[in-house]
Regions:
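N-terminal secretory signal peptides
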Residues: 1-21
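N-terminal export signals
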Residues: 10, 19-44
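N-terminal cap/lid segment of alpha/beta-hydrolase-fold proteins
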Residues: 49-84
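Cap/lid segment of the alpha/beta-hydrolase catalytic domain
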Residues: 123-146, 254-260
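Short beta-strand/loop motif that positions the catalytic acidic residue
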Residues: 216-218
Length: 286
């Protein structure tokens, strides 16, 4: 698919284009309105398409929990290895369309690697994530930024004292969730490891507050997010933050999302996942 089409869809889903402007630009690139509408299913997510770990996988215990946040209870999907052993914990933060089956599936994938994983719903203060993705996107724009960060920081504290964890907590997130993962790293001294996928970078003056080790995944074609890398790296080095950065050439924003035909980049996604699990193993299991 033409990368320009993927780029304007990214601008639309991140709030830089309204739907009318997006469809106008898409029609111009596609060669007409009919062709534009024919492309929409390829651009959107099909969460049922890419389920890898079923909810009833016998190796896991799954369900939903609530933990206290700054705005009240936050609902989260939970998955953990079956058994009585205590394991490290990982927070999985969704993209800018709320908590969906894909992110819950990612949490189960994490759990199968020996972690207790929770995927909080950022839209809990607004009644939870609706099924309609456009409505979910609109609700995400209504969230208060500071309160939302506090709700995810509260997840660190919840997991640190959870009776089924070792008290060691990591965090990972995608797109919007990647940026939120960076904010959790800035605001939680108890976080040990953070893995933002193509996430918006924090302000340089906030970087010295990061105590966690970072594993940074970026997409080579993601001009919008990559524009902030240079300043972020300079701040990380100046503050002596432990980090590794990988650039996945030929991949675009959201390359890990295997529910999106137009965005998923299999080779980049598989390599980033391997590196992520190895990173969490080294930082949370030792």
């Amino acid at each position: 698919m033409d990368q320009r089409i993927v780029d304007i869809y990214d601008a639309y889903t991140n709030g830089y284009l309204d739907r009318r402007a997006f469809l106008k630009k898409l029609s111009l690139l596609a060669g007409g309105t009919a062709a534009a509408y024919a492309l929409l299913p390829q651009l959107g997510n099909n969460c049922a398409m890419a389920e890898i770990v079923p909810k009833d996988d016998p190796r896991l215990e799954t369900g939903y929990v609530k933990y206290p946040g700054s705005t009240g209870d936050v609902r989260a999907s939970l998955a953990r290895p079956r058994g009585d052993s205590k394991v490290p914990a990982v927070i999985v933060i969704h993209e800018n369309r709320g908590l969906n089956p894909h992110i819950e599936d990612v949490a189960r994938r994490v759990a199968l690697n020996g972690f207790l994983a929770i995927a909080p719903d950022a839209l809990s203060p607004l009644g939870g994530t609706p099924e309609d993705v456009n409505e979910a996107g609109s609700k995400m724009q209504q969230l208060d930024g500071q309160s939302t960060v506090k709700n995810f920081v509260a997840a660190v504290q919840y997991l640190k004292t959870h009776p089924q964890t070792t008290g060691k907590v990591g965090c990972m997130g995608f797109c919007w969730g990647g940026g939120m993962t960076n904010q959790v790293a800035v605001n939680s001294p108890d976080l040990r490891a953070a893995v933002p996928f193509y996430g918006r970078q924090p302000a340089s003056e906030d970087v010295p507050r990061i105590k966690a080790s970072l594993l940074l995944h970026y997409a080579g074609l993601d001009k919008r997010i990559n524009a902030g890398i240079e300043a972020f790296e300079a701040a990380l080095k100046k503050a002596s933050v432990d980090y590794k950065l990988y650039m996945y050439e030929g991949a675009g924003h959201a390359f890990f999302n295997d529910t999106s035909e137009s965005r998923y980049h299999k080779e980049a996604a598989q390599l980033a996942w391997k590196r992520t699990i190895e990173f969490f193993n080294s930082k949370l299991k030792t």
